[in-house]
Amino acid sequence: MNLPIVKGEYRKDYNLKHLTWFKVGGNAEIFFKPVDSEDLASFLVQNKQKLPITTFGAGSNIIIRDGGIEGVTIKLGQNFSNIDFTDDGHLIVGSSCLNFSLAKFCQVNAISGFEFLVGIPGTIGGGVAMNAGAYGCEFKDILVRIEAIDFAGNFRTFTNEEIGFKYRGNNLPKDLIILKAVFKVNKGNSEDILARMNEINAARSSTQPIKERTGGSTFANPEGFKSWQLIDKAGLRGYRIGDASISELHCNFMINNGNATAKELEDLGNFVQQKVFEDSGIKLNWEIKRIGKVSSRGLTTG
């Protein structure tokens, strides 16, 4: 395989399991960490959209299937995590910046509206992509625009309106890598902001299995319902397939209890979908992304 000439690092047959919160999954055929945006653009231009591309963030809301990922898996590293101010007073944040890091930066700098990010695992890029939200706020409420690059190597900008935010999603082109996000700045009081962040952390600790190997919310909430309530009603609290189980603490969280496979987790989620539909007539939609190839040792649907 002839790979584009880059300044960054390639790794072949790279184990992705240790990068995910679930600690499951196969290897990346090729793993690439670009040095900067220009290095990424050079790779994409040289690639000419020949090799399949998968982007990878913090690994917090994802199941990588046991057969791994074909083509090139791109992970943006520390060089894409800067936080700064624009000339017009907005915040500009690299897409690999952790949500928690941005929340803490805003608290220290007395910027309000970002408190909810302390309760959302993952990166800014992933948060924008899925319009992540919690405690009454979503990314669409604070975002001005994004800077991105398409798989052909063209730099592009999208405003909040052009992104087309919807519940846990957007209408952006699929062949896009988010590089930076620009946010509104509203001044607040650091002590008040910290108090709200502490409230959110306390609520998470008491209601979510945050110390377990989990991937966050498994299913998006159907309109007018809470997924966890539907799962609980179907009698699935604590239900287990192999080493994968539904959390006893919060039914919309799956847990790897030690040696679960990606297949066991995905099979568990699909089983929950089926049983909730049989019980309530409501189809739950996955919020966790499932990517990669199914292992030849077993088939997984969905």
From Swiss-Prot:
Domain FAD-binding PCMH-type: residue ranges: 23-188
Enzyme class: oxidoreductase
Any one Gene Ontology cellular component term annotated for this protein: cytosol
Paired cysteines (S-S): none
Keywords associated with the record: Cell cycle, Cell division, Cell shape, Cell wall biogenesis/degradation, Cytoplasm, FAD, Flavoprotein, NADP, Oxidoreductase, Peptidoglycan synthesis
InterPro entries named in the record: FAD-bd_PCMH, FAD-bd_PCMH-like_sf, FAD-bd_PCMH_sub1, FAD-bd_PCMH_sub2, MurB, MurB_C, MurB_C_sf, Oxid_FAD_bind_N
Catalytic activity from the UniProt record: UDP-N-acetyl-alpha-D-muramate + NADP(+) = UDP-N-acetyl-3-O-(1-carboxyvinyl)-alpha-D-glucosamine + NADPH + H(+)
One GO MF term: FAD binding
EC id: 1.3.1.98
Pathway: Cell wall biogenesis; peptidoglycan biosynthesis
Compartments, record wording: Cytoplasm
Biological-process GO terms, alphabetical: cell division; cell wall organization; peptidoglycan biosynthetic process; regulation of cell shape
A Pfam family per the record: FAD_binding_4
Active site: R168, S217, E287
Protein transport found in the keyword field: no
Cofactor(s) named in the record: FAD
Listed NCBIfam families: murB (TIGR00179), PRK13905.1 (NF010480)
Family of this protein: Belongs to the MurB family.
PANTHER family: UDP-N-ACETYLENOLPYRUVOYLGLUCOSAMINE REDUCTASE
Function: Cell wall formation.
HAMAP family noted in UniProt: MurB
Protein name per Swiss-Prot or TrEMBL: UDP-N-acetylenolpyruvoylglucosamine reductase
Gene this chain is encoded by: murB
